[in-house]
Amino acid sequence: MVTILDRTSSDEKRIRHPEKAHRPDTEVMRKPEWIRVKAPTSKGYHETRELVRSHKLVTVCEEAGCPNIGECWEKKHATFMIMGEICTRACAFCNVATGKPNALDMDEPENVAKAVKQMGLSHVVITSVDRDDLADGGAEHFEKVIWAIRAASPTTTIEILTPDFLKKPGALERVVAAKPDVFNHNMETVPGNYLTVRPGARYFHSVRLLQRVKELDPTMFTKSGIMVGLGEERNEVLQLMDDLRSADVDFLTIGQYLQPTRKHHKVEAFVTPEEFKSYETVAYAKGFLMVSSSPLTRSSHHAGDDFERLRAAREKKLLAAAE
């Protein structure tokens, strides 16, 4: 049995995933060669780590145990996770801690903005834990963070990766009105897996949320991502692509699910690089402007470069339509 502890102060510890403690340990499959990464050791990685600590910020890179943290932090790229490090949901795939969240940090918007400016970021990704305890799901806080970044770094493009704002009327509208450049909301997996993988969410609510973004602002880029290796069938992935295209989603990411601990959902399969390439080909054929599909693809991986490619793809499409 594996117990994961978080240190919340110099002498206090808490169990990171208390809701998973009763679960039997699951089998951990050996990773194939194509999924392995080196431990981060670079100077740039440590500088980014110190900057994050100095501004008292949380990153999804650390909290979710992202395998790309060494590469991204070496380049001084980071995805900031706002509204704390404790989530009100308990998804079976996720390494973020579950529990009763703390009060919002009112200094966080300014602290994030200062870090963005200090790092000289041309593109930043802001995500959050789920905050079902808040009346607006944290929409106002997202808004304040976006505004603070705009004030501190006017040329920085902003990508947000949001929760689903389930049963939070008006929350989505407020976030879209703050005008992020990219609105990302991950589907995470195919609908048949939701009860076991993402039990607190609703598949078609998430599809509708992405569709609603385009209704509110047709010019805003929309993005979504899924993990594979959770027992899904290929035809289910293709149907999910169709559902996202029906919502006019621009950008799709597909990556390999990696099991954080033995208490999390097990990896049912390691999808080969060839199969990822096949998914990419099909997704482009279905009309996505941008597709990133590989074992180590994550929502925020290469986000800045991908945004430039996404913008260029839209311009190319508009020019072709005008001819």
Curated annotation (Swiss-Prot):
It catalyses: [[Fe-S] cluster scaffold protein carrying a second [4Fe-4S](2+) cluster] + N(6)-octanoyl-L-lysyl-[protein] + 2 oxidized [2Fe-2S]-[ferredoxin] + 2 S-adenosyl-L-methionine + 4 H(+) = [[Fe-S] cluster scaffold protein] + N(6)-[(R)-dihydrolipoyl]-L-lysyl-[protein] + 4 Fe(3+) + 2 hydrogen sulfide + 2 5'-deoxyadenosine + 2 L-methionine + 2 reduced [2Fe-2S]-[ferredoxin]. Transmembrane segments: none annotated. Disulfide bonds: none annotated. Its main location: cytoplasm. SMART domains: Elp3 (SM00729). Belongs to the radical SAM superfamily. Lipoyl synthase family. This is Lipoyl synthase. It comes from Agrobacterium fabrum (strain C58 / ATCC 33970). The gene is lipA.
